[in-house]
Swiss-Prot record:
Enzyme nomenclature, EC number: 2.4.2.4
Organism: Sinorhizobium medicae (strain WSM419)
PANTHER family (UniProt xref): THYMIDINE PHOSPHORYLASE
Top-level taxon in the UniProt lineage: Bacteria
Alphabetized NCBIfam families for the sequence: PRK05820.1 (NF004490), T_phosphoryl (TIGR02643), Y_phosphoryl (TIGR02644)
Pathway(s) annotated for this protein in UniProt: Pyrimidine metabolism; dTMP biosynthesis via salvage pathway; dTMP from thymine: step 1/2
InterPro entries cross-referenced by the UniProt entry: Glycosyl_Trfase_fam3, Glycosyl_Trfase_fam3_N_dom, Glycosyl_Trfase_fam3_N_dom_sf, Nuc_phospho_transferase, PYNP-like_C_sf, PYNP_C, Pyrmidine_PPas_bac/euk, Pyrmidine_PPase_CS
Subunit structure and binding partners: Homodimer.
Sorted UniProt keywords: Glycosyltransferase, Transferase
Protein name: Thymidine phosphorylase
GO molecular function: 1,4-alpha-oligoglucan phosphorylase activity; thymidine phosphorylase activity
């Protein structure tokens, strides 16, 4: 006989280990509505306090994956690979990575999310492109993945519906920051997409959700161990988020930055190092390259030949965007009416910045959400962000604020200027790839 929901909650509350059948039964009730919100909240709090073993977390992830539709790409006969980022500022890596990796052979069915807190969302960026459909029919999604090799869309109602319900409850019960629940939430959606391999970008620094290195490693290790335990070959790179990754933060501005990157104009930057590291990791995981050096060379060829840019343009068009978007982005991406420079406060070197607050500045401009139903102004944000260790003179622009009106842009520019520390000497170079976990 199935265990009553309250007995599952009691067992976990008291520190017991749940068996897969108990977890599966509870999650099935979450998906079909027989578990109440109060019971779901109590379960989440019990997990928050008592934690979960790796095997429990694998069972939770698989149960949430199986609560809805799971995709199968076997008929394509190509490796299926994806990447997930825990989020940061100016992190538009997915936009470039999907077409680069697809140009090398694997298929990349990327199911992405919206902005959360101070971080930007891949879907919000793509919606700055007129006509781009983030919720295509399953048939169109499969057709685009087959023809182009990649498609970036949003989560459908049929993928991991139990996670959608549990996350909404966690959001209002102070249980968002539970490593087992974060792990199962992220991975259930990714595993439902039918992946064979997954690479995780776990951010560390003052622009990430987890600023403590020990906590960051715990989350990264949990994600890697549980995903591998669930049968998906997975690795993680812990990457630096103590400054924006791209030189822009904001939706249309990051799409513009993506096109510049795919056109070969950002080689040698921190952004380039991250994109190439993840492309190499994904290609090796997919078995397309024998080792990472070969994978990076393949990715570089896809970039320099223009094939990755061509695939990005094809993906945009197949999903409803303009056919000539990559040739004429200025005709389609809206520009903010007010652009105001951010002046360096004094001579010296850019030594540090408050990255999270830079993300909040984009939200203040209207480029992100304070509430789930807020409308986003895709035009606004920060551009021309100078990297740390840059030598500047007093009054020299270190960024440009793109705002809906001049008063707003000037107010945000003054705020942004205070978020940078300028020192007499350049700070030590911080590695952009901090570590790798498998």
């Amino acid at each position: 006989m199935a265990m009553l929901p309250q007995e599952v909650i009691r067992k976990k509350r008291d520190g017991g280990r749940l068996v897969p059948a108990e977890i599966a039964g509870f999650i099935e009730g979450l998906a079909d509505g027989s578990i109440s919100e109060g019971q779901a909240a109590a379960f989440a709090m019990a997990v928050w306090f008592s934690g979960m073993s790796r095997d429990e977390c694998v069972a939770l992830t698989l149960a949430m994956r199986d609560s809805g539709e799971t995709l199968d790409w076997g008929e394509f006969g190509r490796p299926v690979v994806d990447k997930h980022s825990t989020g940061g500022v100016g992190d538009n890596v997915s936009l470039m990575l999907a077409p680069i990796v697809a140009a090398c052979g694997p298929v990349v069915p990327m199911i992405s999310g919206r902005g959360l807190g101070h971080t930007g969302g891949t879907l919000d960026k793509l919606e700055s492109i007129p006509g781009y459909n983030i919720q295509p029919s399953p048939e169109l999604f499969r057709r685009v993945v087959d023809e182009v090799g990649c498609a970036i869309i949003g989560q459908t109602a049929n993928l991991a519906p139990a996670d959608k319900r549990l996350y909404a409850i966690r959001d209002v019960t102070a249980t968002v920051d539970s490593v087992p629940l974060i792990t199962a939430s992220i991975l259930s959606k990714k595993l439902a997409a039918g992946l064979q391999s997954l690479v995780l970008d776990v951010k560390l620094g003052n622009g990430s959700f987890m600023t403590d290195p020990a906590e960051t490693e715990i989350l990264a290790r949990s994600l890697v161990e549980v995903a591998n335990g669930a049968g998906v070959r997975t690795s993680a790179l812990i990457t630096d988020m103590n400054e924006p990754l791209a030189d822009a933060a904001g939706n249309a501005l990051e799409v513009e930055n993506c096109l510049a990157y795919l056109s070969g104009k950002k080689a040698g930057t921190r952004l380039d190092r991250v994109v190439m590291a993840f492309a190499a990791e994904m290609l090796a995981a997919a078995g397309v390259s024998a080792h990472k050096a070969e994978g990076e060379a393949m990715a570089r060829r896809a970039l320099e030949s223009g094939e990755a840019l061509e695939r990005f343009g094809l993906m945009v068009h197949r999903l409803g965007g303009p056919a000539d978007f990559v040739e004429r982005p200025e005709a389609y991406l809206e520009r903010a009416p007010a652009i105001v420079p951010v002046a360096a406060a004094r001579d010296g070197y850019l030594a540090a910045c408050e990255t999270r607050e830079l993300g909040m500045a984009v939200i203040a401009l209207g480029g992100g959400r304070r509430r789930p139903d807020d409308r986003i102004d895709h035009r606004v944000g920060l551009a021309g962000l100078r990297p740390l260790r840059t030598k500047v003179e007093k009054g020299e622009p270190i960024a440009f604020v793109h705002g809906a009106d001049r008063d707003q842009a000037e107010a945000v520019a003054k705020r942004v200027a205070t978020l940078y520390a300028i020192a007499e000497e350049a700070p030590a170079q911080r590695p952009v790839i901090a570590s790798r976990l498998v």
